[in-house]
């Protein structure tokens, strides 16, 4: 018998099985093909706004995605650097082939983990509890817990034009019985849709008609364990390119709108709001004269370019016209045509904050089956599901992150409390406390928590403590370093637009000012540190007031989260509650007053009434 069985070896499944096996649980992962472990069927990249911070959080919790992303990156780019640190995010262009190889090897080397190459027919449920899985050949594998991370493979159809083909992503097979076994147990499913653009042969593109988009020329990384020698040097990194749709492109799309699976009535599932198809963009943003597209390399082993922003479900002949209307792609050869894919997802309102099903005990779900989109969102969920399944086996308290602790916490709270009717994507705007949830401080927020439950090694924890001590010492030294007015200092301040010093002050006081850095003051203080130490001191000092306010605001949330609501509260008979509140509270059954307050349709007077019932 296994402690944990994971169904599906995509980005959620990988982190789930690695988390549970690192916590010394006997784990198995079932995949249709070992060669598809960690595949990237859509964009060949990791990170981006909000999502890049999730990858940093996965690193702080001992996950594998950040390590794999660093070591297989073709380009590193820090985004939003003209804005405040609360929205800085790293994005890497990934080598999708190298990434798959890295992840497959990581799973094969992991202790306490078996890889089973098979199709999973159903989750086996007895007396309301998941007790294992049945494979397509009718083999039963018993397990104390099951984690479903089947991605877009449940009853999936690939759609182009007026044609629907029973298939999973990248011409892989689909499984039609798995979601039925869930529905039979009372779990609600619904249809979602996503899509992917065409891939074209690199050597048939005229890149002189495109704008080069190089990466960031500095050492960047997702994982704190990555060293400079582990990543591709800047001069060897690939360059992406920017182009725009043309009037001819729009004309072709408008002419053939009725041929798109999206608009012909073939698609029943709801598509992603924040990553729409190109035909959807033209309909929704009719006033825009052009849309930007990025030409992105997929792998050093492939001669293909991914056209980011150009997903479509048009027929193949129309796709030929569309692609050839783009600048630089007039004579290109299409290697793989775009498609939309429709699949079954489960209603996340039936999931507890620890990712266990409310309907079937010992069944955990993570990734796109929960209604999310994106590799990073999936990986973050997978890690949490794997950890919580392991904790459930041990009879320990669940591991749940608050909204002020992690973007992963924001995502899971949104899913459990608000649900979703469309593919959910993390955005910085979803986080009320984004100044606390920064790229730079993920380890400070989460690493100790990961260490306490067995996700993070002693070696990694010791390195973290050493780093925190170095930051503390550096702050003290800079606070004690007195800078007196003199001509050199005055000249430095003047070059940055400041008046000369009227009297002496500490280096830390000067660092509060914009543009003044630890390195810039080094010749006056004799103090300089590693780049990440300098960055921490500068962010903590320059944004101290804003960070303090965010922490005060978060305290209110923390107090609300401590106020527990009994699972068996009879909301239907609380006459003072509004009708909508009674219905939604009965369905969602929030665990805390804080969670109840975030349910749409619950008003302050309802919360006041509930506060009297807090146990």
Task: Locate each region found by the language model.
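A glycine-rich dinucleotide-binding beta-alpha-beta segment and adjacent secondary-structure elements
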Residues: 306-372, 400-413, 531-584, 589
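Glycine-/small-residue-rich beta->alpha transition segments that form the dinucleotide
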Residues: 145, 150-154, 314, 327
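Conserved N-terminal/central alpha/beta ligand/cofactor-binding core
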Residues: 18-122, 149-166, 173, 177-178, ...
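An anion/pyrophosphate-binding glycine-rich loop and adjacent beta-alpha core
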Residues: 33-35, 180-320, 417-503, 512
């Amino acid at each position: 018998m296994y402690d944990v069985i994971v169904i599906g070896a995509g980005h959620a499944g990988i982190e789930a099985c690695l988390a549970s096996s690192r916590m010394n649980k006997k784990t198995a992962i079932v995949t249709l093909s070992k060669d598809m472990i960690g595949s990237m069927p859509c964009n060949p990249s990791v990170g981006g706004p909000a999502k890049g911070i999730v990858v940093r959080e996965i690193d702080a919790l001992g996950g594998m995605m950040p390590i794999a992303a660093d070591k297989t990156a073709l380009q590193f780019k820090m985004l939003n650097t003209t804005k405040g640190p609360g929205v800085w995010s790293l994005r890497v262009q990934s080598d999708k082939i190298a990434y798959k190889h890295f992840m497959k090897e990581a799973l094969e080397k992991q202790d306490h983990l078996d890889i089973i190459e098979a199709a999973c027919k159903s989750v086996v449920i007895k007396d309301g509890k998941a007790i294992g899985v049945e494979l397509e050949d009718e083999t039963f594998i018993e397990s104390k817990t099951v984690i479903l991370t089947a991605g877009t493979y449940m009853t999936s159809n690939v759609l182009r034009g007026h044609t629907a083909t029973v298939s999973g992503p990248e011409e892989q097979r689909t499984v039609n019985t798995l979601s039925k076994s869930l529905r039979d147990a009372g779990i609600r499913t619904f249809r979602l849709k996503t899509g992917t653009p065409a891939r074209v042969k690199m050597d048939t593109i005229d890149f002189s008609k495109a704008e080069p988009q190089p990466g960031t020329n500095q050492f960047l990384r997702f994982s704190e364990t990555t060293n400079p020698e582990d990543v591709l040097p800047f001069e060897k990194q690939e360059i992406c390119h920017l182009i725009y749709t043309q009037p001819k492109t729009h004309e072709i799309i408008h002419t053939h709108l009725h041929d798109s699976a999206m608009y012909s009535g073939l698609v029943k599932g709801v598509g992603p709001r924040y990553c729409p198809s190109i035909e959807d963009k033209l309909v929704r943003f009719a006033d825009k004269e052009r849309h930007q597209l990025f030409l992105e390399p997929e792998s050093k082993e492939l001669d293909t370019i991914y056209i980011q922003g150009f997903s479509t479900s048009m027929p193949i002949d129309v796709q030929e016209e569309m692609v050839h209307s783009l600048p630089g792609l007039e004579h290109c050869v299409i290697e793989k045509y775009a498609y939309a894919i429709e699949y079954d997802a489960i209603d996340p309102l039936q999931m507890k904050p620890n990712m266990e099903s409310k309907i079937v005990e010992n069944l955990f779900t993570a990734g796109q089956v929960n209604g999310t989109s994106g590799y990073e969102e999936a990986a973050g969920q997978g890690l949490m599901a794997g950890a919580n399944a392991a904790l459930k086996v041990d009879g320990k308290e669940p591991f749940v992150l608050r909204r002020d602790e992690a973007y992963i916490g924001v995502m899971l709270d949104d899913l459990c409390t608000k649900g979703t009717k469309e593919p959910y994507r993390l955005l910085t705007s979803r986080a009320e406390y984004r100044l606390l949830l920064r790229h730079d401080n993920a380890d400070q927020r989460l690493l100790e928590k990961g260490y306490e439950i067995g996700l993070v090694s002693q070696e990694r924890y010791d390195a973290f403590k050493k780093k925190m001590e170095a930051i503390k010492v550096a702050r003290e030294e800079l606070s004690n370093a007195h800078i007196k007015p003199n001509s050199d200092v005055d000249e430095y301040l003047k070059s940055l637009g400041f008046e000369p010093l009227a009297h002496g002050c500490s280096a830390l006081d000067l660092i509060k000012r914009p543009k003044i850095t630890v390195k810039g003051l080094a010749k006056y203080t004799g103090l300089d540190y590693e780049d990440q130490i300098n960055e921490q001191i500068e962010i903590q000092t320059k944004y101290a007031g804003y960070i303090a306010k965010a922490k005060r605001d978060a305290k209110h949330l923390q107090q609300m989260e401590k106020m527990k609501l009994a699972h068996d509260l009879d909301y239907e008979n609380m006459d003072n509650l509004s009708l909508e509140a009674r219905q939604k509270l009965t369905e969602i059954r929030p665990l805390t007053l804080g969670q109840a307050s975030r349910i749409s349709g619950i008003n302050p007077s309802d919360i006041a009434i509930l506060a009297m019932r807090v146990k």
